Amino acid sequence: MNQFVSELTALVAEASLAPSVHNTQPTRWRLAADGSILVLEDTLRRLKIGDPTGRDADVSHGAAIEGFALAASCRGFGVAVEPLLGPSLAELRPVARLSLVTGQTPDELARPARLRRTYRGAFAPARTGTALDPLERADDVVLLRKASDIAQIAALNDAASLRLYRHAPFRAELLSWMRLSRGDPRWSIDGLNAEAMEMSRLEAAGASIVLARGVFETLDRIGVAGPLIAEAPVVRSAKAIALFHRPEAETPLETGRRFYRFWLEIAALGLSASPMAVLADDPLAASEIRQSFGLPLDRRLITAFRLGLAPRHPTGPKPRLPLDTLLVA
């Protein structure tokens, strides 16, 4: 049993590398008496304003489950997933039951899991050559390479972000997950720290002021809030935009699994990426993207990744919760 617990701990450590909305890391793991693994949601980490239905949390759980399955494959195990429905108990909501099965060969996407990072800065001007070509073959991706298309996405992203930021409760919730100073005790644990957002100390200090209630509204009235939060120059530095879409009827768990795999496919090509989820969350932006780029009506836009080559510079470890928090009794 001790060996199995040790193995489970190693699998959870690998699974924790998966992305989650705002890096909230809502997924918890419990070893059941029958040897299966229960996947649970820490409901205290739900984004009550940004994700009231819990869809983004479930996509995050799906990514974590895929990370677990990738790690298990390297140990010769496959993973059977049984979605669970049920009420929360002590702030933990049942999500899925995982059962390990033998005979699995290592998944080739397991290795890029340690390479994958979100890069939110301007991409290097270096050419990507044919590196993007394999992404064209995915049936759930529309790849935009024309400068005019990338510029259109950049403008849509800024407009959608401004509409969303005008919602003060959303901004307050976002700020609560932003770690804008290295003095924040949660800098290396969770949320979005300034380093991960490619912010200088000055930019991080400015963000804490600009996004504050009252200040943002005043800046918006005089027409400067939009330019201050604009990302268009950064987005236009991308070599391509990948519109990632999935079937409307697909469960968020399945969407999350494929979302993580696609991001790992990007990393395996030596590319960096940053998702622009606001383009899917904002109805006006999502509608224009559907019309402009021919997304079928039975498909849901999940996000738009900006893709390119990140400049080489040292980065700290990914902010992650300790394993004794992720594994629950």
Predicted features and spans:
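Acidic, surface-exposed loops and disordered segments
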Residues: 1-329
